[in-house]
């Protein structure tokens, strides 16, 4: 008998003729616009950019459907008398114009929140300051061998228009950022928090708001919910006190009686006296102890859904995700790695700790108001030459210089204007058996649209050499 999603059918009927505001014309909202338009919603779109900065693909939909639009400065002045407001992750939910509409009776939601509300199947959400994408990709890779899976959120494809394809036995896997979770009042069935450290403090009001946003991934679970958290991180460990359902810990450092641990170079599932070996470190292709943590998280999230043997097989074949310690090429005995995803000092520290070779490090980008002092010691320990660029160049240089003075050591630090100059400089100074690591410890927005564009530019310049 064919499955009928009653909740989806009710929504589809209800949205017909309703006034819908879509805030943010990112490419991910294109399927949302198409779907809501097909249902007969009266759509108005809003974006703080001018038209020439909006992707032509999505702007073509605005003109094709003859949608009302408001762009640029003061773009929300006409946000009035709407039934639904769909916000993109880059738009804060507490803007005065949005709050005024909510107080008037509008429903504030998002593509992700509607997926959680209307999907008829199990949902797994992954968040954290670092390791989200690798952990999400691993969970998806492990489960898709046995289940029909849908991958969405920060990676994969927008899923709102695909809810009609979902059946109760399927699984939705979502990578969720603090911006997506910010005003969320629904949680995933299984919630994974990889770790929490200061991040995006240029957007969030303070660190507590960032932490609270992350906590929404499990806050609304019932007693059947599962929360997978990092025992080695003080903040995620503390989340256990707020959990409504079952808590599953993973740890790289502690020998826990229950949960997923890394012991004797092996990832193990522990259930009191029963210990099941999943995979040995030598069989893992992705580098770094931080990736062992990501593997532990993925195993903890999927251990009730697949066997350890099925987990092992997928993990053995997993080669990682683009822009995450990605090998680019070897030239004259020097290996080049792209770690453009590293938008925080913690990410770069994890990258530095992944190599035994001496490193030429390229770092710097947009300033997120983070503390760069913690990165100084790992740089001095692993790096022969530091190349800095972007808004954070001076902050990184100053942090390292202070620590060099403390240790009475020296390190060559070179400031450059851009990625192209950084690659040329690294080519001139890197010696055989060294590696060049592009790990910015900063976001990309001072020079690029996103970290993907930044990483592609780095690879392009390296491959020109």
Predicted regions located by residue number:
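Beta-strand->loop->alpha-helix junctions that form or flank phosphate-binding loops
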Residues: 72-73, 109-113, 244-262, 312-316, ...
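Phosphate-binding loop of NTP-binding sites
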Residues: 34-38, 60, 76-82, 89-231, ...
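Nucleotide phosphate-binding/pyrophosphate-handling subdomain across enzymes
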Residues: 3-19, 29-39, 148-149, 279-385
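Short internal beta-strands
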Residues: 42-50, 227-231, 362-363, 382-391
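Short beta-strand "acidic-cap" motif of Rossmann-like dinucleotide-binding folds
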Residues: 43-47, 150-151, 173, 249, ...
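Residues in the short beta-alpha loop(s) of Rossmann-like NAD(P)-binding domains
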Residues: 26, 49, 155, 232-233, ...
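N-terminal leader/targeting and accessory segments in enzymes
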Residues: 1-110, 114
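C-terminal helical cap/extension that packs against the catalytic core
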Residues: 59, 375-434
């Amino acid at each position: 008998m064919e499955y009928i999603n009653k909740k989806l059918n009710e929504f589809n009927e209800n949205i017909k003729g309703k006034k819908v505001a879509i805030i943010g014309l990112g490419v991910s909202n294109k399927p949302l616009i198409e779907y809501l338009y097909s249902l007969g919603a009266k759509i108005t779109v809003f974006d703080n950019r001018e038209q020439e900065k909006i992707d032509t693909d999505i702007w073509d939909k605005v003109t094709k459907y003859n949608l009302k639009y408001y762009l640029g400065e003061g773009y929300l002045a006409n946000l009035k008398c709407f039934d639904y407001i769909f916000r993109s992750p880059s738009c804060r939910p507490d803007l005065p114009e949005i709050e005024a509409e909510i107080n008037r009776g509008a429903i504030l939601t998002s593509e992700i929140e509607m997926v959680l509300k209307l999907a008829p199947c199990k949902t797994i959400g992954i968040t954290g300051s670092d390791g989200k994408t690798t952990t999400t990709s691993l969970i998806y890779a492990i489960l898709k061998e046995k289940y029909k899976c849908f991958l969405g959120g920060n990676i994969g494809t927008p899923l709102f228009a695909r809810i009609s394809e979902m059946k109760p036995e399927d699984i939705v896997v979502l990578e969720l950022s603090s911006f997506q979770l910010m005003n969320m009042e629904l949680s995933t069935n299984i919630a994974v928090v990889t770790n929490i450290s200061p991040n995006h403090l240029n957007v969030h009001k303070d660190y507590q708001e960032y932490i609270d946003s992350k906590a929404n991934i499990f806050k609304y679970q019932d007693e059947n919910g599962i929360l997978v958290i990092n025992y080695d991180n003080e903040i995620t460990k503390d989340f256990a006190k707020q959990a409504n359902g079952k808590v599953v810990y993973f740890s790289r450092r502690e020998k826990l009686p229950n949960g997923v641990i890394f012991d004797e170079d092996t990832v193990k599932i522990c259930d009191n006296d029963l210990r099941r070996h999943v995979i040995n470190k030598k069989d893992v292709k992705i580098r770094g102890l931080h990736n062992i943590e990501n593997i532990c998280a993925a195993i903890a999230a999927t251990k009730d859904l697949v066997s350890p043997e099925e987990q092992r097989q997928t993990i053995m074949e997993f080669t990682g995700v683009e822009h995450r310690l990605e090998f680019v090429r070897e030239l004259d005995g020097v290996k080049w790695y792209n770690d453009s995803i590293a938008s925080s000092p913690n990410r770069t520290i994890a990258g530095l700790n992944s190599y035994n070779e001496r490193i030429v490090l390229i770092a710097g980008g947009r300033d997120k108001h983070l503390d760069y002092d913690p990165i100084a010691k790992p740089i001095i320990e692993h790096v022969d030459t530091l190349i800095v660029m972007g808004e954070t160049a001076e902050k990184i240089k100053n942090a390292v210089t202070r620590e060099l003075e403390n240790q009475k050591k020296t390190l060559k630090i070179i400031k450059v204007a851009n990625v192209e100059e950084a690659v040329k400089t690294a080519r001139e100074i890197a010696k055989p058996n060294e590696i060049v690591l592009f790990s910015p410890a900063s976001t990309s927005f001072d020079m690029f649209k996103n970290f993907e564009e930044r990483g592609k530019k780095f690879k392009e310049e390296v491959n020109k050499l």
